[in-house]
A protein has these predicted regions:
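Short acidic, gly/pro-rich beta-turn/loop elements at beta-sheet edges
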Residues: 150, 385, 493, 581, ...
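A broadly conserved detector of short glycine/acidic/proline-rich loop/turn motifs that flank catalytic sites
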Residues: 264, 269-270, 344-346, 350-351, ...
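Membrane-embedded transmembrane-helix bundle of lipid-linked glycan/lipid transferases
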Residues: 2-455, 459, 470, 478, ...
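A short, structural micro-pattern
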Residues: 149, 178, 369, 541, ...
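Extracytoplasmic
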Residues: 2-9, 14, 61, 75-79, ...
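Beta-strand-rich recognition domains
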Residues: 204, 639-669, 713-738, 744
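Glycine-rich loops and low-complexity Gly/Arg-rich segments
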Residues: 110, 179, 283-284, 371, ...
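Beta-strand-rich ligand-recognition modules
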Residues: 671-674, 679-724
């Protein structure tokens, strides 16, 4: 009989735990060597990612996430729910915390009531990214993988690099990257959602944890939530002989998770009528996915896991797949990993491959399908762990035959001493570091590049930011509405503080602005993209009172220069404020999918300079009647604002206006049914004014008009529902455990 070497502290199966047995006494530290691997990986991340903690304005989407944390902290301090509050800063405002995955910002905002919110944001980014290998190890153990397999997966987890750059990889999160911070939060819960779902379809003893982590994943990041529910659909079919019972458990887990996440899902669906679809990115691979041909090309050429380097992770992913397929009949966890890898790979192909068939996926018209790459990455990490241990085990078997040998009659070699086991474990760790050298050296170079750029930005802030801050201090002291500092599609992209465009820098200072486009689901986000800076009528429509432009660049419309500091000049416009009086002389038909392009003619027209606008027939509903039948019969302006007090961050605006004839008082804020209006203290119905603004009709005369945002009002019952579901499952699990104890079953078996 041939002797077979095993990894120290491992099991007889490289990837699965054997039935529970009394553990042998091990005097060697080899038993803890897998945890040493995880610890070394975490320590490496903590060291490499230190620049994340530097306070600089962000170049990527982290700017909006940090701003949401500040906003959440402020609303929580004042006793309000962020979900029912008006987020005013981008896209002419929106109920951002309802339409977007806002739980990470709320949790960080809670921390931000104790410490500085920006500090809370930076530390959350740093710790969630550096400590992520821990949750990968935990996930592997939930699937029943051996300690070494789970630790190997954890060691691989920080080192993925793909062409899209928005999967589970460093580039997705850091300063020179994309800043998909909410995805990072859900990257902690998705592995646990998969692991506990794998267990729950075998035994409901893990159901409460599966429900909790599936629901949390959906609340933290919508696209990741789809991947969490994908496991609920896939895992019942892993064991055909027990299919119906597994399906029943999966239905229970899925239904309970939907109920537990209803506080996010129900408001989102109920108010989706008022959330814009991104017309600019619609139909592109960013929304539709890159398609089977492109994804498979990246996969087989190494660019899905190892872009720009030797495909070391890709190799181990394919080895892991081969091992799992070879052991398909006995290795249930391997079936699970290969199955979820294949399903998420198919999901990543998107509408580019499947076309209208993708409509079967609920809500798919509002998600960016390319983000499903996360599922391919997570399952690939676990498969790479399987592949690494298989290769290591094969190498150890060869070494044992060479160095320990075996007797001529096939008897096993002598037992390996504890000191030898420790030496083998140490060699395995060193070997892992060497094997992954192409990955960690590549990432180290990228981290160095990121660190250098963060340092350069910090240096530029000391001079350039100080100059711009002087102008912003004037803006705050003399409020006149929003600030415009260019667009990503014109001179604004190259008008910078260090490397950060000024329109992004304004966001870091919580300056209400126009120009940082396509950041929210506001109905005005697409019309903002088509803002015509050469049309004087667009400025009051968008509530712009100030222009910040490069020194030497004249104002595109008549304006008065206030001051210049360094390369930055501040101009004030002649018709400032958030509230204006318009005649409405016709109807614009638009939907949430075309409101931007439908508004192009209006935004380019001279009508706005004469304070003429249109009402909107939105999503097939009837428009409010215009205040005038024809613009030709009108003479002069319809009225003006006498006094304005705007506190949009609190959802409150008050104005005193004079109307020369029946007219519409328009608030330059994105339309939402949560807005309420009063005229002279009496409630009045709001009207939708083109492109998608909120207004109220008034008669001739002087009037006091108020606008207040109330928000979605059904959160409390939904919070209670989530709590009841989780408590009920927890109680049922507890009493089930008590019954098993009473029956003499004190320890549950591990899943296969």
């Amino acid at each position: 009989m041939t002797a077979t070497a095993r990894l120290p502290g491992g099991t007889d199966d490289i990837a699965t735990e054997p039935p529970p047995q009394p553990p042998p006494v091990q005097r060697s530290w080899a038993r803890y060597a897998p945890w040493v691997v995880v610890a070394l990986t975490v320590l490496w991340g903590l060291f490499e990612l230190r620049p994340v903690l530097r306070a600089v304005p962000y170049l990527d989407d982290s700017s909006i996430h940090e701003q949401m944390v500040r906003f959440a902290a402020a609303r929580i301090r004042s006793g309000h729910l962020p979900q029912t509050s008006w987020f005013p800063y981008l896209g002419l405002g929106s109920p951002q915390f309802l339409h977007y995955q806002s739980l990470p910002a709320i949790l960080s905002g809670l921390a931000g009531t104790v410490v500085d919110p920006d500090t809370a944001f930076r530390w959350s980014l740093y710790l969630l990214l550096a400590l992520w290998p821990v949750t990968i190890y935990w996930c592997g153990r939930l699937f029943g993988l051996s300690r070494w397999t789970a630790a190997s997966a954890a060691a691989v987890s920080p080192f993925l690099v793909s062409v899209p750059g928005i999967g589970y990889e460093t580039k997705a999160y850091v300063w020179v990257g994309y800043g998909v911070w909410t995805q990072l939060w859900a990257s902690w819960t998705l592995p646990l959602a998969w692991g506990f779902t794998y267990r729950a379809v075998r035994s409901l003893r893990s159901a409460v944890w599966a429900v909790l982590f599936v629901a949390l994943t959906a609340a933290l990041h919508f696209e990741t939530g789809y991947l969490a529910f994908a496991a609920v659909v896939v895992f019942p079919f892993l064991v055909p002989s027990d299919l119906w019972r597994r399906l029943g458990r999966a239905v229970l887990v899925g239904a309970a998770a939907l109920l537990a996440a209803a506080w996010v899902i129900v408001p989102l669906l109920d108010q989706s009528h008022w959330a814009a679809r991104n017309q600019i990115l619609g139909g592109t691979p960013l929304e539709n996915g890159y398609g089977a041909r492109q994804i498979l090309d990246w996969l087989f050429t190494g660019h899905l896991y190892d872009d720009g380097r030797f495909p070391i992770v890709t190799i181990f992913v394919f080895v892991g797949i081969a091992v799992c397929v070879a052991r398909w009949r006995t290795f249930v966890a391997g079936r699970a990993l290969v199955s979820i890898w294949a399903v998420t790979l198919l999901m990543t192909f998107g509408r580019t491959t499947f076309g209208a068939l993708y409509r079967l996926l609920p809500g798919s018209s509002d998600i960016f399908i390319r983000r499903f790459e996360m599922g391919v990455h997570l399952s690939g990490i676990l498969l790479a762990g399987v592949g690494l241990v298989f290769v290591a085990q094969a190498a150890l078997d060869i070494a044992r035959r060479l160095f320990w040998g075996e007797s001529p009659d096939g008897r096993p070699a002598p037992t390996v001493s504890p000191s030898s086991r420790a030496a083998i474990a140490a060699l395995c760790i060193v070997g892992l570091v060497v094997v992954l050298a192409p990955a960690w050296t590549n990432l180290d170079a990228y981290d160095t590049h990121n660190s250098v750029n963060v340092g350069l930005q910090a240096a530029d802030d000391t001079q350039q930011a100080t100059q711009l801050d002087q102008l912003l201090a004037y803006v705050r002291a003399h409020p006149r509405g929003r600030v415009y500092a260019g667009l990503p599609t014109n001179w604004g992209q190259d008008f910078v503080v260090g490397a950060v465009p000024v329109f992004k820098y304004l966001e870091s200072k919580d300056i209400d602005e126009v120009g940082y486009t396509l950041r929210t689901a506001s109905l005005m986000t697409d019309p903002e993209y088509y803002f015509d800076e050469s049309n004087p009528g667009d400025y009051p429509l968008f509530g712009i009172g100030y222009l910040i432009a490069p020194e030497g660049l004249p104002s595109p419309v008549p304006a008065q220069r206030v001051a210049c500091r360094g390369a930055y000049c501040l101009w004030k416009l002649p018709d400032p404020g958030y509230v204006h009086v318009y005649d409405t002389t016709g109807v614009l038909s638009a939907t949430r999918a075309d409101v931007g392009k439908s508004s192009l003619t209006l935004l380019d027209s001279p009508l706005l300079t004469r304070q003429r606008d249109l009402t909107v027939a939105f999503n097939g509903s009837a428009a409010s009647a215009p205040t005038a039948r024809s613009a030709a019969a009108l003479h002069g302006r319809p009225g003006r604002v006498l006094v304005e007090h705007a506190r949009l961050a609190q959802g409150q605006v008050r104005a005193v206006v004079t109307a020369h004839r029946r007219a519409t008082v328009v608030l330059s804020a994105s339309y939402d049914p949560g807005w309420r209006a009063t005229v002279d203290g009496h409630p009045a119905p709001t009207v939708m004014v083109a492109p998608a603004l909120v207004g109220v009709n008034v008669r001739p005369g002087v009037h006091t008009v108020t606008f207040g945002y109330g928000g979605y009002g059904s959160y409390v019952p939904l919070f209670v529902l989530a709590l009841v579901v989780l408590v009920a499952l927890g109680v049922a699990t507890y009493f089930g455990w008590r019954r098993r104890v009473t029956a003499g079953i004190s320890r549950p078996s591990r899943p296969s």
